[in-house]
From Swiss-Prot:
It is found in: Cytoplasm. Pathway: Amino-acid biosynthesis; L-arginine biosynthesis; N(2)-acetyl-L-ornithine from L-glutamate: step 3/4. InterPro entries: AGPR_AS, AGPR_type-1, NAD(P)-bd_dom_sf, NAGSA_dehydrogenase, Semialdehyde_DH_NAD-bd. This is N-acetyl-gamma-glutamyl-phosphate reductase. Its EC number is 1.2.1.38. GO terms for molecular function: N-acetyl-gamma-glutamyl-phosphate reductase activity; NAD binding; NADP+ binding. It catalyses: N-acetyl-L-glutamate 5-semialdehyde + phosphate + NADP(+) = N-acetyl-L-glutamyl 5-phosphate + NADPH + H(+). The active site is at C147. Its main location: cytoplasm. PROSITE patterns: ARGC. It comes from the Bacteria. Belongs to the NAGSA dehydrogenase family. Type 1 subfamily. It comes from Staphylococcus aureus (strain NCTC 8325 / PS 47). GO terms for biological process: L-arginine biosynthetic process.
Length: 343
């Protein structure tokens, strides 16, 4: 059994890791770390976990017996705590944005904080699971993608790879539920402000914009810029990303659907919807699926892609476990076979 530790145990990402890893046949949750709740029983913070008798612990580097540690923490915590663990030889999967952006200047411009050391950035492997493989011996630090980038990159990757788009035309209109903001209180997520309301935010300067651009540029082999506008909607979970992109070759809905279906034929967590149907966030709730609907406006040769995920599962903890499975050469679906919760 692989001994796993979870850092940031009082947050939503960590709680999803605990929920999902309980069904993983090759994993035991050895330690749950939270610096603010040391020695408190887990069930005190999360009463729905009454059946789990573990207590929160303080993270230590010396004598740490974990094979893998998941970090579901803010980026500053990850930047400080992860390098010593990696140096010790422990595999780390980081759910924060600390190691995603390889250019330190760009990171600091968007995150408004000092970037990680360049050596740490160079060693971190950014992993959208559907196109990644690892060397178990050589890979020590995996940088889990953000939620918006996951939904967006999975939809765009086939089109960019096949070089069938005008790279200057990418527009991403994305909606997210409130859990994406974490458990910290703020006026923006106060019930009276959020309920029966819809708002755009971080226009032009969202932290996920450079992440999307960086990895689209890698796929394209040239610099790619996008227009990305996120919106906050009054629901708990879910991301719906509607992507508009001009096609540089003549495609119909049928031919683009065929390309996308072929591209993801062997990827169990990406479901290309039938022509004429488009996914909703409820249809992936609580699951590791990304559902994608496709339409081509032949008059303007514009592809419209609708991509949905659960931001806490495929957009965070589920993909982190998927990366664990790849790292240890398990079946990619191990511990992640949950059907969406419906209704």
């Amino acid at each position: 059994m692989i001994k796993v530790g979870i850092v940031g145990g009082s947050g939503y990402g960590a709680i999803e890791l605990i929920r999902l890893l309980q069904t993983h046949p090759h994993v035991t949750i050895a330690h749950i770390y939270s610096h603010s709740k040391v020695d408190e029983p887990l069930k005190l913070t999360f009463p729905h976990l009454q059946h789990i008798m573990q207590h929160f612990e303080a993270l230590t580097v010396d004598n740490n017996d974990c094979d893998v540690i998941f970090f579901a923490t803010p980026a500053p915590v990850s930047k400080t705590c992860i390098p010593p663990l990696v140096e010790k030889g422990i595999h780390v999967i980081d759910l924060s944005g600390a190691f995603r952006i390889k250019n330190r200047e760009i990171y600091e411009a968007y995150y408004k904080e000092t970037a990680a050391a360049q050596d740490d950035l160079n060693h971190a492997i950014y992993s959208i699971s559907e196109w990644q493989s690892f060397d178990n011996n050589g890979t020590k630090l995996i940088s889990n993608p953000g939620c918006f980038p996951t939904a967006t990159l999975l939809a765009l990757h086939p089109l960019i790879s096949e070089k069938i788009v005008d790279l200057s035309s990418i527009i991403i209109d994305a909606k997210t539920g409130v859990s994406g903001a974490g458990r910290s209180l703020s006026q923006r997520v106060h019930f009276s402000e959020m309920n029966e309301n819809l708002s755009a935010y971080a226009i032009g300067n969202h932290k996920h914009k450079p992440e999307i651009e960086q990895y689209l540029s890698i796929i394209a082999g040239q610099d790619v810029s996008v227009i990305f506008t996120p919106h906050l909607v009054p629901m708990t979970r879910g991301i719906l990303s509607t992507i508009y992109v001009k096609l540089s070759s003549e495609y119909t809905t049928e031919s683009l659907h065929k390309l996308m279906t072929s591209y993801y034929a062997n990827q169990p967590f990406v479901r290309i919807r039938d022509i004429g149907t488009f996914p909703t966030t409820k249809e992936v709730l609580g699951s590791n699926y990304c559902d994608i609907g496709i339409y081509v406006d032949e008059t303007t040769q514009t592809a419209i892609l609708v991509s949905v995920i659960d931001n806490l599962v495929k957009g965070a903890s589920g993909q982190a476990i998927q990366n664990l499975n790849i790292l240890y050469d398990f079946e990619v679906t191990t511990g992640l076979n949950q059907s969406p919760v419906y209704p």
